[in-house]
């Protein structure tokens, strides 16, 4: 069974967690921004919306 040779330092652990959390924050901001633009109708959205799907059928 694979076992780490040495304990990871707290600073390295914290740095990795900070990177991971920052990526999550950036993705959350993008999602919120996209949601706001869709609600205001200012978006040029790539995926078809429910209204467009109904018109095509």
From Swiss-Prot:
Keywords: Ribonucleoprotein, Ribosomal protein. GO terms for cellular component: large ribosomal subunit. This is Large ribosomal subunit protein bL32. One of its GO terms (molecular function) is structural constituent of ribosome. The gene is rpmF. One of its GO terms (biological process) is translation. Residues 1-22 are annotated as: Disordered. NCBIfam families: rpmF_bact (TIGR01031). Belongs to the bacterial ribosomal protein bL32 family. Signal peptide: none annotated. It comes from Nostoc punctiforme (strain ATCC 29133 / PCC 73102). PANTHER family: 50S RIBOSOMAL PROTEIN L32, CHLOROPLASTIC, LARGE RIBOSOMAL SUBUNIT PROTEIN BL32C.
């Amino acid at each position: 069974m694979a076992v780490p040779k040495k304990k990871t330092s707290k600073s390295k652990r914290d740095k990795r967690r900070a990177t991971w959390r920052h990526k999550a924050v950036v993705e959350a901001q993008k999602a919120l921004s996209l949601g706001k633009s869709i609600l205001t109708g200012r978006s040029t959205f790539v995926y078809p919306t429910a209204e467009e799907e109904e018109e095509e059928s």
